[in-house]
Amino acid sequence: MHSSTLTPSDLGTFVRRVRKAQGLRQDQLAGVAGVGLLFIVDLEAGKPTIQVGKLLTVLEALGCKVAITPPTGTEEAP
């Protein structure tokens, strides 16, 4: 599954779909990722103020990779 997430809501929907595809409940994902259940609930609801570090931990627990692509015509940072 590939997705270009543009909003917190898009990201929440993406995480929910991947979680359900893996047969996990929200509490199970929270346990595997080492975050609280409320964080998963807020993430999947599209809360715009979630913590990026925890988000990355959840994505890693789901086996997802994050790629950031610089705008065309710009140099990549070293």
Segments (PLM) and residue ranges:
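A detector for short, charged/polar N-terminal pre-domain segments
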Residues: M1-D10
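Short basic helix-loop element that most often maps to the first helix and adjoining turn
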Residues: T13-V32, T57
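Acidic-residue sensor for enzyme active/binding pockets
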Residues: Q26, E44, E60
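Recognition helix of helix-turn-helix/homeodomain-like DNA-binding domains
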Residues: G34-P48
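Short, basic-rich loop-to-helix N-cap that marks the start of a DNA-contacting helix
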Residues: K47-L59
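Short, charged recognition helix plus adjacent turn
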Residues: E60, A67-P78
